[in-house]
From Swiss-Prot:
InterPro entries: Ribosomal_L11_MeTrfase_PrmA, Ribosomal_PrmA_MeTrfase, SAM-dependent_MTases_sf. It is found in: Cytoplasm. GO terms for cellular component: cytoplasm. This is Ribosomal protein L11 methyltransferase. It holds the Pfam family PrmA. It comes from Lactobacillus acidophilus (strain ATCC 700396 / NCK56 / N2 / NCFM). The gene is prmA. S-adenosyl-L-methionine binds at T163, G184, D206, N248. Keywords: Cytoplasm, Methyltransferase, S-adenosyl-L-methionine, Transferase. Methylates ribosomal protein L11. GO terms for biological process: methylation. Its EC number is 2.1.1.-. Belongs to the methyltransferase superfamily. PrmA family.
Amino acid sequence: MKLLIIKIDTSYEVEDALGVFATDNLKALGIESRKRSDFEQAGWLHDSTVVEMDDIKDLPKDTYFYAYFDEEADKDELVEKFQAKLEELKSYGLNTGEGKITTSYIEDQDWNTAWQKYYHVIDFSRHLAIVPEWEDYQPAFSDQQLIKLDPGLAFGTGNHKTTQLAMMGIERAMVKPMSVVDVGTGSGILAIAASKLGATNVLATDISDESMTAAKQNSALNNLTNIKVQKTSLLAGVEGKFDIIVANILAEILLDLIPQMDAHLNKDGQVIFSGIDYLQLPKIKKSLDENNFKIDLTMKQGRWIGLAITRKEK
């Protein structure tokens, strides 16, 4: 099987908007971005990362955005839609960069390994670092926990702002050993983070077979036995209640999750949301209010919003 790659020479300012457009509107199989700043700040200046000299000449002026599609997808139609989206973003006064779009094809199995040289250690916080399984890394702090990860094609490598917002929320909420459910687990990164931070038992749910496989493999890679993986839509069929519900998924899906939360949240439990575009925040707030929840903390990175949520006091 081959994958169609659409590459856009663009700007970090519209990176997130292109990502949402590619996944939501065009149903991309995967997205990726490479920014010059990633290498300048976390590449050759980071002891744990090696950037080969041959790669430097290929770095973007600003940002390369990649979207991956099935080889049978209509290449010309997709290019036209991306061009129209760039024009729309430019009309808002946003910097879209050069806007050059190129296409190519790659063998699926080649993609699974070729991209690895662009994915390196992420020193997320004093307590957590995300380490690809092919890299050797020593903790920066004596109490720093390492999340070993082989994300493959599953969403959730730790690079994206939405994943980082969700991890920030988990760190803040985990004040004692707690039970956690990670809804829409993807690669399992948030479930693993919760376990590493002291969760006593963790449930990871997803509707995707690929995510189920990735989450199980990544849990095993971290030698974790307290993470259970369940294939289901959101919390359907999930038994029991949890101290923390975490979900890094699109706002439209969060709206379906909100009515299910009360039945699965312990007294004084907390909910962590991420994956919310700031334009979607008003309807999330409205639904939370209608379901007896309130926002305790709003976190923001770029256009993405993370929320810490609890029940309203009666």
